[in-house]
Regions:
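Non-transmembrane "mature" sequence context
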Residues: 1-146
Length: 146
């Protein structure tokens, strides 16, 4: 996750108010995720990833958990919480690498040739996919060949 700050990941999840705590370290964030994040983080994350596109927000929410699961439980399962944190980390890294929240949103939701013409936000739903997206973003951030 370095050099990405925990606070930036928290912002993508909706902040301390939405998460219900304010972790400042990776250890604290991991413990918060392991307990299960509140269901509200799904809509906050979706809004941060695609605020002006209802269909894209639905896609992002579906990457975390099903609508039926959200209706049944107030908290996400640990597995769904990990997915939410992973996607929030990618949203935060895209903002950092691209320097602009709007540019990051466009990049996350547009098919990318280095990701098999898939949308980066969708590729990042798996651990391996997130690593691929992180590599592309780090190359962008540090002006390396993409």
């Amino acid at each position: 996750m370095y050099p990405l700050e925990v606070g930036k990941v928290m912002a993508a999840l909706g902040g301390a108010r939405t998460v219900g705590s304010a972790p400042n370290t990776l250890v604290e964030l991991a413990a918060t995720v392991a307990r299960g994040l509140p269901g509200e983080v799904v809509s906050a994350l979706a809004a941060n990833a695609a605020p002006d596109d209802v269909a894209a927000r639905r896609r992002v929410a579906a990457l975390v958990t099903s609508a039926a699961s959200l209706k049944r439980r107030d908290r996400l399962s640990p597995v769904a919480s990990e997915r939410a944190e992973r996607l929030a980390r990618i949203v935060a890294l895209a903002r950092q690498a691209l320097g602009d929240a709007d540019e990051a949103r466009l990049w996350l939701n547009a098919p990318h040739p280095l990701l098999g013409s898939a949308r980066p936000i969708e590729v990042a739903a798996t651990d391996l996919g997130a690593r691929q997206v992180e590599r592309v973003l780090h190359n962008i951030e540090y002006d390396l060949p993409v």
